Design a protein with these regions (language model features):
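Receiver (REC) domain active-site loop signature in two-component systems and cognate sites
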Residues: 75
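Short hydrophobic/Thr-rich beta-strand motif most characteristic of the beta2 strand and flanking loop
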Residues: 45-52, 60
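C-terminal output helix
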Residues: 126-136
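Charged docking surfaces used in two-component/phosphorelay signaling
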Residues: 35-43
Length: 158
């Protein structure tokens, strides 16, 4: 029986008619988190590239030419907010969609992310399906889809 759901994987593979899969640069200092994000995005048709920290991200931008970035905040050498500020300060990456995926869940962190122009802010632990939906939306909308999924001190989500 045919599904009434749209073929999202086919949509992603066509990447808005460009003939290639959308590229996501996953930036996190934890190899486990990088792999978790990568596997979930690859299963949904994204081409995934990995970076260990903000400097590694900036070094890979030209060769990868990502359609979006997932970015942790707390990383060695160059943290996520400093990386994001550099991305927003360069004409070529000023509007590049960025989804923060981090354990930093304070209101001040969310506010700083908004000020720097992130499309979404997901906190760890995150729901892989929500991550995929959020990245897909950021890639295909091109506009801010700011959402904040931040855990409360009791472990529930806002």
């Amino acid at each position: 029986m045919p599904s009434s759901q749209p073929d999202v994987t086919a949509e992603l593979r066509s990447s808005a008619g460009s003939g290639r899969r959308p590229r996501v640069l996953v930036v996190d200092d934890s190899e486990v988190i990088r792999q978790l994000i990568a596997v979930n995005l690859e299963l949904e048709g994204f081409e995934v590239h990995l970076a260990e920290d903000g400097l590694d991200c900036l070094d890979r931008l030209e060769s990868v030419q990502p359609d979006a970035i997932t970015l942790d905040v707390v990383m060695p050498r160059l943290d996520g907010f400093a990386t994001l500020a550099r991305l927003r300060g360069a004409a070529a990456t000023r509007t590049l969609p960025v989804v923060m995926v981090t354990a930093c869940a304070q209101e001040s962190d969310l506010a700083r992310g908004r000020e720097l122009g992130v499309q979404a802010y997901l906190t760890k632990p995150f729901d892989p399906a929500e991550l995929v939906r959020t990245v897909r939306s950021a890639v295909f909308s091109g506009a801010s889809v700011f959402s904040a999924s931040a855990s409360r001190p009791d472990g529930s989500y806002k």
